[in-house]
């Protein structure tokens, strides 16, 4: 079972709406999902500032969890989306088969992207 599916079980168990088709939830749920992700990003920022690896791991895990929850709230299958992003990212190689990086270390799009 994927993490995305585990979050679905949590949401169903706790009476949270899980959409079966892609559509906007209520404004209240939309704002809640945004707020949860924002809160976890702020916690990550604080953990990084304090160089607390345990809190960094906690924040990153919570970011995944609330993001998966947002996917279910909007009816977006994030397992499928992730697979597409992975395929796309793996196509970011130069013609020599090596990654292309910009000056900050970000992987850039290759000619076959």
Residue ranges and their predicted role:
Residues 1-113:
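Flexible "arm" and connector segments at domain edges
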């Amino acid at each position: 079972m994927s993490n995305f599916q585990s979050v679905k079980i949590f949401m169903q168990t706790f009476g949270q709406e899980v959409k079966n088709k892609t559509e906007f939830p209520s404004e209240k749920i939309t704002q809640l999902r945004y707020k949860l992700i924002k809160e976890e990003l702020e916690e990550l920022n604080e953990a990084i500032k304090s160089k607390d690896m345990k809190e960094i791991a906690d924040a990153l895990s919570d970011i995944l969890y609330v993001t998966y929850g947002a996917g279910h709230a909007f009816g977006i299958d994030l397992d499928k989306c992730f697979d597409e992003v992975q395929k796309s990212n793996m196509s970011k190689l130069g013609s020599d088969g090596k990654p292309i990086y910009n000056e900050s270390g970000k992987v850039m799009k290759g000619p076959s992207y």
